[in-house]
Swiss-Prot record:
Keywords: Aminoacyl-tRNA synthetase, ATP-binding, Cytoplasm, Ligase, Magnesium, Metal-binding, Nucleotide-binding, Protein biosynthesis. It catalyses: tRNA(Phe) + L-phenylalanine + ATP = L-phenylalanyl-tRNA(Phe) + AMP + diphosphate + H(+). It comes from Idiomarina loihiensis (strain ATCC BAA-735 / DSM 15497 / L2-TR). The keyword Nucleotide-binding applies. This is Phenylalanine--tRNA ligase alpha subunit.
Amino acid sequence: MQLEQIVEQAESAIAAADSPTALDEVRVEYMGKKGQLTELLKGLGKLDPSERREAGQKINEAKQQVQTSINARKELLKAAELAQKLEAERIDVTLPGRHSAVGGVHPVTQTIRRIEQFFGDLGFSVKEGPEVEDGFHNFDALNIPANHPARADHDTFYFTPSTMLRTQTSGVQIRTMENEKPPLRIISPGRVYRNDYDQTHTPMFHQVEGLMVDTDVSFTQLKGILEDFLNHFFEESLTVRFRPSYFPFTEPSAEVDVMGKDGKWLEVLGCGMVHPNVLKAVGIDSEKYTGFAFGMGVERLTMLRYGVNDLRAFFENDLRFLKQFN
C-alpha cells in the first residue's frame, strides 16, 4: 500500500475517533509495534541502499504527521469531555444558599475570654497551674488553718491526706509569687472543684482570680479596677458596693455586690488586700510590698449577664440552650 494512502486512512480514522479509547486504537493500528507505519520502517532493509535513506525520511515524516494529528485530536476530545462535565455539574448561582452547620464558643469560654481581654489591657498576664494540688499551695500558704471548714472532707475532693483537687485557683498565685519577684500582675482562670451540687453550685466550675503585688498597692486601686471591670463586663453603668467580709488570705476583705434591675443587691465576687502572712509564706517582704487579690465565679457572672437561672444548664450540652449564645 502506498505511503500516502496509509497516511490518508490514518487521518480519516483519527478524525472519526470519538473517544480517547478509540483514538488510542488508531494510534496502535498505525504507530504501534506492529502498526502499518512501523512495518514500513522494518521493511527498509529490503530496499536498495540508494533508495533506503529517502524512503526512511518519508516514512518518518509520515509518522510525525500522524502523531501530530493524534495529539491534536486528543486535545479536542479532552476539551469536549471537560465541557460536557462542566455542563453536567453546572451550579445555578441564583438558587438560595445552604447554611453550614458550624459550632460556637461555649458561654463560659466567652466569659473567660472577656475577662482575660479586660485585665490584659491593664497589663495583667494569664497564669495557669495544676488542678491536683498539695496542701501547702491550696491551704497552708493561703493562711487557711488546719481546722478551717474548707479543709473538711465534705467540701474538698481528696486523693490522699496531702493531695486534692484544687478548691480555688489561688494556688497559681502562690506558685507565681514563689517563682517571680514583684511587681506582679496576674489573673489565673481555670477549673476548680468543690463537693457541692444544686441550682447554683456544681462539683466542677470555673474561677478567675487576680493578684497584684507591688509597692504602695492600695484598696483604692482594687476598688477602681473592679468597678471598671464590672461596668465593662455588663456593658452598663452599675451601682456597686463593697461589703466588709472575711477571707483567711486577705485583710481587709470585701464582697462586691451590684444593684440588680429589681433593686436587689447581687453578690458577684470577693476581694481584699493580700494578708501579710501569705506574702511571708512565699518569701516576699510584707513591710516593703503590699498587694490585692480578687476572685470571681465564671458561671455566676455568665448567669447574671445572660439571665440564666440554673448553673447546671452550662454543663448539660443542650444545643437548644447553647445556640442562644452564638
